[in-house]
């Protein structure tokens, strides 16, 4: 019986020593620290070079909006229906018009256009103007769209190549 208590005591002491170290490492990891710095939270506002800086709480709210409204088809920045077009910054910058800024993404969410900007895809892609596709997007207001755009533009900075990277990362 005494050896059982001694064994439990040693295990408890080890746990009390190791647990704070593990918690400390997870809280102070470089990825977590870099996740919310001003550079990460600053993204292009429009095509004219102006910038906008989101707050940490805005991006956290935006993450919830993205997950509840967009992640069904765009989980981790991948487009399920077209693997050639992701939500990574390079793909967004090559769209026409460019969608690598808040204004461009908000406009796309209001009026979805093909990647080359030639025709509307509102009948097949959810958006504020979409007919019967994912009608709950119609409940999003301009601020919600702005936050979702901010989340998309900061996600690659936080997640790296995994954002929009496709199947090789899953």
Swiss-Prot record:
Note accompanying the cofactor annotation: Binds 1 heme c group covalently per subunit.
SUPFAM superfamilies with a match to the protein in the record: Cytochrome c
Keywords: Electron transport, Heme, Iron, Membrane, Metal-binding, Photosynthesis, Photosystem II, Signal, Thylakoid, Transport
Membrane topology: Peripheral membrane protein
GO molecular function annotations of the record: electron transfer activity; heme binding; iron ion binding
Signal peptide: 1-33
Keyword rRNA-binding appears in the UniProt entry: no
HAMAP family from the UniProt entry: PSII_Cyt550 (MF_01378)
The protein's name: Photosystem II extrinsic protein V
């Amino acid at each position: 019986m005494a050896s059982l208590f001694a064994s439990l005591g040693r295990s408890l002491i080890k746990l009390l020593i190791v647990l704070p170290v593990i918690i400390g490492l997870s809280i102070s990891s470089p990825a977590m620290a870099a996740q919310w710095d001003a550079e990460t939270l600053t993204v292009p506002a429009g095509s004219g070079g102006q910038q906008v800086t989101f707050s940490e709480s805005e991006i956290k709210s935006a993450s919830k909006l993205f997950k509840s409204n967009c992640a069904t088809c765009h989980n981790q920045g991948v487009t399920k229906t077209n693997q050639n077009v992701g939500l990574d910054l390079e793909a967004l910058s090559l769209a026409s018009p460019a969608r690598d800024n808040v204004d461009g993404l908000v406009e796309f969410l209001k009026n979805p256009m093909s990647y080359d900007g030639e025709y509307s895809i509102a009948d097949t892609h959810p958006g504020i103007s979409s007919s019967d596709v994912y009608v709950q997007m119609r409940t999003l207001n301009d601020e919600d769209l702005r936050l979702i755009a901010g989340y998309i533009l900061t996600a690659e900075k936080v997640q790296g190549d995994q954002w929009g990277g496709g199947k090789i990362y899953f």
